[in-house]
């Protein structure tokens, strides 16, 4: 592969155009891909998802794996309320964290589709999410529904950003990404008795409140907040001195092209990195926290670190995790190593082509584009497609030295920007 040097691209003036640099137009996976295309919304489809005039949209932050999910002890909740599901705790936590969907959302949908969690019958264990998924088996349905919710959520955000960039009104109907994702999924499974007619989001909100005691004022949000939130999100980038690269200071690793968390669709929130991109069974190296924050161990192979500001980073395909839930870490604290064994790297299933770290950027539980994000002195330009490795479009720009660094070339980690 030939890597060309290029000058840093000028930043567009509009935050919506800035965000559009991260919209997906295809691409080929190098290391990690769920294999499903992005969910595409249209005006016609959205016309079928109108909120009832008396309904309020759901709070995005309670839909996503953000502060509320991080404070939720899923294993303890299942032990008390659903002992038959306790052995599924890590599986639920892992995939909820991977798709960054609050596990409370999943449990609420289970109750709506198959009844109380306390004593599920054989049918409920085989198909806990009923007609919301065409898959069979507990694990398959759980992952399928989380994947559907994620695709719908980010597909809606992408559609809104395109509309805003075209100077079309967005958010005025009060429909936000969380509401669109859940409403669309529930109406897909409308033959299930729990969501026949009426307001399926109302039934969802009531069930959520009953299960977790969340006040309506927290679960719902005013309609007029939707457009403001979109505009704020379009211009998001972490503070330039908050993060470093996720490997040891003083070392050089090779990152690949930016891509979505799943390898297809929007936003380009992630990149994969490895010391030397070896085969399975080869030596692997230390993964460190890119910034200070609180640890959440999502599974044996996945960790998240969340800064008090709401910025977070996710670390997947891990091994030898040496931090624990609630632990406070600083930048460059060792979290573990990236796994050299495929079964360890994919501790709850999935796909991967070889040993590497899958690294993602989030804000308040939502995956956000790496466009313009700084890691030490390097500012990222994400390119125009998933896994875009062309250095004319995707690169790390060293703001101190004025140099451009391409994909699959060693990238030195000097630490945090001064």
Swiss-Prot record:
Q: What's the cofactor?
A: Zn(2+)
| CC annotations in GO | extracellular region
Name the predominant localization: secreted
Q: Which InterPro entries match?
A: Cell_wall_metabolism_enzyme (IPR050570), Dup_hybrid_motif (IPR011055), Pept_M23A_Blytic (IPR000841), Peptidase_M23 (IPR016047)
Quick check: keyword Zinc in the entry? Answer: yes
Q: Where is this protein found?
A: Secreted
Supply the alphabetized keyword list. Disulfide bond, Hydrolase, Metal-binding, Metalloprotease, Protease, Secreted, Signal, Virulence, Zinc, Zymogen
Propeptide, chain numbering: 32-236
- Gene Ontology terms for molecular function: metal ion binding; metalloendopeptidase activity
* Entry-linked Pfam families: Peptidase_M23
The record's Gene Ontology biological-process terms are: proteolysis
Which CDD domains did the record assign? Answer: M23_peptidase
The active site consists of: 317 (proton donor/acceptor), 356 (proton donor/acceptor)
| Enzyme's top EC category | hydrolase
Q: Which residues bind Zn(2+)?
A: 259, 272, 358
Disulfide-bonded cysteine pairs: these are 301-347, 391-406
* Cofactor: how bound: Binds 1 zinc ion per subunit.
- Might you give the EC number(s) for this enzyme? 3.4.24.-
Q: Where is the signal peptide?
A: 1-31
Function text:
Involved in proteolysis and elastolysis (degradation of the host protein elastin). Has staphylolytic activity (degrades pentaglycine cross-links in cell wall peptidoglycan), preferring Gly-Gly-|-X substrates where X is Ala or Gly. Enhances the elastolytic but not proteolytic activity of elastase (lasB) and elastolytic activity of other proteases. Degradation of elastin is likely to contribute to the pathogenicity of P.aeruginosa.
Protein name per its UniProtKB record: Protease LasA
Origin organism of this chain?
Pseudomonas aeruginosa (strain UCBPP-PA14)
């Amino acid at each position: 592969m030939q890597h060309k040097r290029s000058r840093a691209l000028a930043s567009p003036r509009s935050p919506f155009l800035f965000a559009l640099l991260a919209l997906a137009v295809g691409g080929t996976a190098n290391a990690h891909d769920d294999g499903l295309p992005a969910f595409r919304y249209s005006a016609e489809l959205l016309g079928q998802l109108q909120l009832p005039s008396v309904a309020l949209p759901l709070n995005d932050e309670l839909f996503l794996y953000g502060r509320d999910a991080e404070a939720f002890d899923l294993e303890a909740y299942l032990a008390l309320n659903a002992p038959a599901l306790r052995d599924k705790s890590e599986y639920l936590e892992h995939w909820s964290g991977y798709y960054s969907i609050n596990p409370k959302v999943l449990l609420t949908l289970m109750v709506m589709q198959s009844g109380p969690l306390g004593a599920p019958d054989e049918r409920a264990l085989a198909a806990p999410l009923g007609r919301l998924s065409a898959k069979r088996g507990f694990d398959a349905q759980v992952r399928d529904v989380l994947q559907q919710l994620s695709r719908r959520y980010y597909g809606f955000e992408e559609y809104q950003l395109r509309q805003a960039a075209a100077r079309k009104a967005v958010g005025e109907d009060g429909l936000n990404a969380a509401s669109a994702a859940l409403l669309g999924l529930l109406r897909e499974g409308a033959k299930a008795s729990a969501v026949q007619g009426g307001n399926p989001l109302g039934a969802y909100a009531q069930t959520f409140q009953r299960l977790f005691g969340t006040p309506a004022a927290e679960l719902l949000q005013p309609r007029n907040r939707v457009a403001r939130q979109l505009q704020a999100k379009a211009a998001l980038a972490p503070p330039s001195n908050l993060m470093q690269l996720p490997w040891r200071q003083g070392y050089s690793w090779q990152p690949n092209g930016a891509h979505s968390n799943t390898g297809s669709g929007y936003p380009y929130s992630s990149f994969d990195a490895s010391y030397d991109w070896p085969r399975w069974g080869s030596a692997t190296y230390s993964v460190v926290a890119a910034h200070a924050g609180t640890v959440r161990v999502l599974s044996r192979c996945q960790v998240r670190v969340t800064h008090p500001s709401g910025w977070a980073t996710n670390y997947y395909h891990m091994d030898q995790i040496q931090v624990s839930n609630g632990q406070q870490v600083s930048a460059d604290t060792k979290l573990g190593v990236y796994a050299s064994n495929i079964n360890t790297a994919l501790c709850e299933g999935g796909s991967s082509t070889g040993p590497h770290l899958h690294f993602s950027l989030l804000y308040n539980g939502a995956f956000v584009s790496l466009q313009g994000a700084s890691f030490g002195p390097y500012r990222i330009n994400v390119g125009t497609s998933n896994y875009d490795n062309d250095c004319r479009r995707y690169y790390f720009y060293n703001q101190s030295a004025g140099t451009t660094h391409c994909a699959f070339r060693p990238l030195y980690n000097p630490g945090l920007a001064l």
